């Protein structure tokens, strides 16, 4: 049997998932239970769309709870004191010059379980993340992206 997938995460990422899990287990489950009770009060379940919707919501929520529990159970938390100051790694904040857009961007390198590109938290497994990990200030990397090749220069590295 294969080993379960391990999720490299920052301490902040673990705390965020724990908060989401707590919300789903306490608040969301109660909301769904109430929706099911109300829908059952409407009688005939064969044509009860409120009941169907509540049961679907329940199934989705329970699946999400299992997913979060699995990620937390298999989380490998990055020790901030072990994050190198001069090499990009999980837990680093990296300021880069994006030559395609002629702008500076700051990314946080995180594990795939906590990636959020809209918040500039990119996974170490993403194309840009893979290209940056292991590099130093002054290094220039070419990254294969869906639109072609992007070029980034590492301007600064900090611990997360």
From Swiss-Prot:
Q: Which PROSITE patterns match?
A: GREAB_1, GREAB_2
Full protein name? Transcription elongation factor GreA
Coiled coil ranges (UniProt) are: 49-75
Q: Which Pfam families has this protein been placed in? A: GreA_GreB, GreA_GreB_N
Its biological purpose is as follows: Necessary for efficient RNA polymerase transcription elongation past template-encoded arresting sites. The arresting sites in DNA have the property of trapping a certain fraction of elongating RNA polymerases that pass through, resulting in locked ternary complexes. Cleavage of the nascent transcript by cleavage factors such as GreA or GreB allows the resumption of elongation from the new 3'terminus. GreA releases sequences of 2 to 3 nucleotides.
Q: Does the keyword Transcription regulation apply?
A: yes
Identify a single GO molecular function assigned to this protein: DNA binding
Q: Which InterPro entries match?
A: GreA/GreB_C_sf, TF_GreA/GreB_CS, Tscrpt_elong_fac_GreA, Tscrpt_elong_fac_GreA/B, Tscrpt_elong_fac_GreA/B_C, Tscrpt_elong_fac_GreA/B_fam, Tscrpt_elong_fac_GreA/B_N, Tscrpt_elong_fac_GreA/B_N_sf
| Biological process, per Gene Ontology | DNA-templated transcription elongation; regulation of DNA-templated transcription elongation
Q: Which Gene3D superfamilies match?
A: Transcription elongation factor, GreA/GreB, C-terminal domain, Transcription elongation factor, GreA/GreB, N-terminal domain
Q: Which family does it belong to?
A: Belongs to the GreA/GreB family.
Q: Which UniProt keywords apply?
A: Coiled coil, DNA-binding, Transcription, Transcription regulation
| Transcription in keyword set | yes
